[in-house]
């Protein structure tokens, strides 16, 4: 079994899972459907969390008992949690800049690669954590170790397999610049991020949480991963990466401020800490990502494209459905700020006018008019 969810507290554990899953979906909808909701979620709340965490840090440095006994200091003091929450927030803010075309940066075509960059950074943070556990096994000879937060982790080849899977997963992201705003500005769309990537990512990331956050994986592994995936498959096609960033940031802030939910309440759920299970899950993650990258190479060769500069999933059902959600060019032109240059507008129009089915290998080339 993966988790200890069959004892006397099982009803609370399943209830807790349902609350997290539904809560994340609802919070994501609030954040994506309005600018105010997004600014509150990723502006006001992060500021409040930062002030709270800084106050605790100052208190700890001064030896204050209230700070030393604060749950955030006890359970969420590692480098990973702080790196993850702020990296996720950076992604959310960048995505809002793209979908709302905020400033010159938000309108720049080169900035559309920001989703790739920030997702890669988030993956590398997790890979670093997996390799940290592997170090305890290979360098220190430990098959288990206890983190600074009091969490027991397994250490071994499972971390190596999943760390490699994470690195491969970075290169499973295709069409880095093919990012658009949706018709209603609710979403930033990445049409080339189809089910192939989503499934490979979800398996890898679940395995990461199972390896390195075994006492949290019931929530941050299953509920947190399924919330954006369900939204993408049922009502927000093409918006998975935004769903993922939004729900991740919201969950990380909640976990940072209210860690007792996962640590000392009736909702606490631990993994079984079974080495065989952890290894099997890690091998599955590696196999899934190898399969994904092989399929991407196959499609790239079939279409004759560079899968990173151009789209690899042109002509697929998921790709077309996402492309059909793009904002109309006429609307984009109406809302272009006065500061937009003719070159910026021409590039935006060229990409936005591509057919929903896609154009294999398309790359915009600016045409300079002869001056007479």
Where are these regions (language model features)?
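Hydrophobic cores of alpha-helical transmembrane segments in multi-pass inner/ER membrane proteins
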Residues: 16-24, 82-99, 161-176, 224-229, ...
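Juxtamembrane loop-transmembrane helix junctions in multi-pass integral membrane proteins
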Residues: 4-7, 75, 103-106, 149, ...
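Membrane-interfacial helical/loop segments at transmembrane boundaries in membrane proteins
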Residues: 1-2, 61-79, 132-154, 265-273
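Hydrophobic alpha-helical transmembrane segments and adjacent interfacial helices
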Residues: 44-66, 92-100, 116-133, 195-211, ...
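An N-terminal, globular interaction/scaffold subdomain
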Residues: 2-102
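C-terminal transmembrane-bundle signature of multipass membrane proteins
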Residues: 21-25, 220-351, 361-363
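Generic multipass alpha-helical transmembrane bundles of integral membrane proteins
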Residues: 105-238
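Membrane-helix interface "capping/anchor" motifs
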Residues: 29-40, 100-110, 233-246
């Amino acid at each position: 079994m993966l988790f200890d969810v069959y004892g006397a507290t099982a009803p609370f554990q399943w209830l807790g899972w349902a609350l997290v899953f539904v809560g994340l979906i609802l919070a994501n909808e609030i954040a994506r459907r309005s600018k105010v909701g997004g600014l509150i979620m990723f502006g006001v709340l992060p500021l409040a969390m930062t002030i709270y965490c800084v106050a605790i840090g100052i208190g700890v440095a001064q030896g204050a008992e209230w700070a030393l006994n604060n749950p955030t200091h006890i359970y969420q003091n590692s480098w990973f949690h702080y790196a993850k929450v702020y990296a996720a927030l950076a992604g959310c803010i960048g995505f809002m800049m793209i979908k709302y075309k905020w400033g010159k940066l938000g309108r720049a075509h080169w900035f559309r690669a920001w989703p790739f960059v920030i997702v890669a950074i988030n993956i590398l943070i997790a890979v670093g954590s997996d390799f940290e556990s592997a170090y305890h096994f290979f360098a220190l000879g430990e098959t288990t170790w206890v983190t600074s937060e009091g969490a027991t982790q397994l250490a071994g080849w499972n971390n190596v397999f999943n760390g490699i899977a994470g690195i491969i997963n970075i290169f499973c992201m295709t069409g880095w610049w093919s990012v658009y705003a949706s018709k209603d500005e609710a979403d930033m769309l990445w049409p080339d991020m189809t089910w192939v990537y989503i499934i490979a990512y979800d398996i890898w990331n679940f395995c990461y949480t199972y390896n390195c956050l075994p006492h949290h994986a019931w929530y941050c592994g299953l509920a947190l991963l399924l919330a954006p995936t369900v939204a993408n498959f049922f009502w927000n096609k093409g918006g998975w990466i935004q769903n993922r960033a939004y729900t991740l940031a919201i969950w990380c802030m909640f976990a940072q401020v209210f860690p007792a939910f996962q640590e000392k309440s009736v909702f606490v759920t631990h993994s079984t800490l079974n080495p065989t299970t952890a290894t099997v899950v890690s091998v599955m993650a590696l196999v899934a990502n190898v399969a994904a990258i092989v399929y991407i190479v196959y499609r790239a060769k079939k279409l004759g494209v560079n899968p990173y500069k151009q789209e690899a999933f042109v002509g697929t059902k998921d790709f077309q459905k996402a492309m059909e959600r793009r904002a109309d060019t006429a609307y984009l032109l109406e809302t272009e700020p006065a500061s937009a240059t003719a070159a910026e507008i021409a590039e935006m129009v060229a990409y936005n006018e591509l057919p929903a089915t896609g154009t294999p290998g398309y790359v915009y080339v600016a045409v300079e008019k002869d001056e007479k």
